[in-house]
Structures are given as structure tokens and as C-alpha cells.
Amino acid sequence: MSHPALTQLRALRYFDAIPALEPHLLDWLLLEDSMTKRFEQQGKRVSVTLIREAFVDQSEVEEASGLLPSESRYWLREILLCADGEPWLAGRTVVPESTLCGPEQVLQHLGKTPLGRYLFTSSTLTRDFIEIGRDATLWGRRSRLRLSGKPLLLTELFLPASPLY
């Protein structure tokens, strides 16, 4: 099963540098903290609609090429992050199988728990970069994060109902 928003997310084109945008947009696109937390600060009840969670081969995560170690399998999680039941963000997390050892195994068992609830409570979380992307109409971003030094790639597409717009 897929979702049209995930097709748009995969179509994002990334800027080589941070573009000159309105401060309001940059505030959302360059947020270092949890997007889940930001949505909750808007007074919303945040929930996850799980689209897909599975091991996939490298051909299904081509956007990770050069950004993550080359491995035969990756854990892929695709979700919609909803605020009061309305989708505000599409998310796609790609985790190399080698990252899923030790406490990071929990990434395979998040289910309907927002990723941010786990990531941003970890004292071992670091972020290598944020890249801003855009398709024809929507903004997005991707980040390489590390848990205990082990990488994962998070891509987020802000949907039309999101307060980013």
C-alpha cells in the first residue's frame, strides 16, 4: 500500500544551499527539535497513520544512495503524521540494517508511535544535516540523523493542511 503524499515526498528536489525564504518557512523547515512536539505545541493531538513498515532492498531506497552505508537491506517506515486526525506531514525513514543493533532495534517496533517521541528522548541523537526540498507545490526536508553514531535518513513532506503554509 502507498499514499499519494509519499509519491510527492519521493519526488522532492533538494536545494544545494539553504534558500532565501520567509522566516516562517525557515522556522519550520530548519527545526532541529521534534516535529511531533511542534505539532503538539499547536494545540493538536498528534497521531500516526502507518502506511508501510518493512525490510526492503537497496533498489527501494535509492534516495539514500551516498547518504547511508550501502547495505543489502534497510528498514523502511512510511507514515502520515496527523494533527487532530488531519494529515499534516508525510514521513519516510530509511534505516540501514546495521543501525538496528542494540537499543536501536526499537526502530523496528514503533508502530503508531511518532518517531520523534523516540528519537528526541535519546541522549545519543545527533543530526548531520538538514536539506530543504520542494516539489511543484509542497515543501519538504531530509536529515541524516545518528543514534549512538549509527545513521538513519528521515524525509518529511509538509502537507497542505500543515501550519507551514
Swiss-Prot record:
- Which InterPro entries does UniProt cross-reference here? Chorismate--pyruvate_lyase (IPR007440), Chorismate_lyase_/UTRA_dom_sf (IPR028978)
The record's annotation in Pfam families points to: Chor_lyase
Would you identify the family this protein belongs to, as annotated?
Belongs to the UbiC family.
Protein's GO biological process: pyruvate biosynthetic process; ubiquinone biosynthetic process
- Compartments it resides in: Cytoplasm
Q: How does it assemble?
A: Monomer.
EC number(s) given by UniProt: 4.1.3.40
Q: What is this protein called?
A: Chorismate pyruvate-lyase
Key words, A-Z: Cytoplasm, Lyase, Pyruvate, Ubiquinone biosynthesis
Q: What does this protein do?
A: Removes the pyruvyl group from chorismate, with concomitant aromatization of the ring, to provide 4-hydroxybenzoate (4HB) for the ubiquinone pathway.
Q: Which organism is it from?
A: Salmonella gallinarum (strain 287/91 / NCTC 13346)
**Principal place of residence:** cytoplasm
Reactions listed under catalytic activity: chorismate = 4-hydroxybenzoate + pyruvate
Alphabetically, the GO molecular function entries are: chorismate lyase activity
Q: In which pathway does it act?
A: Cofactor biosynthesis; ubiquinone biosynthesis
Q: Where does substrate bind?
A: M35, R77, L115, E156
Give the first-level EC class, as a single word.
Answer: lyase
Ranges in a coiled coil:
none
A GO CC annotation recorded here is: cytosol
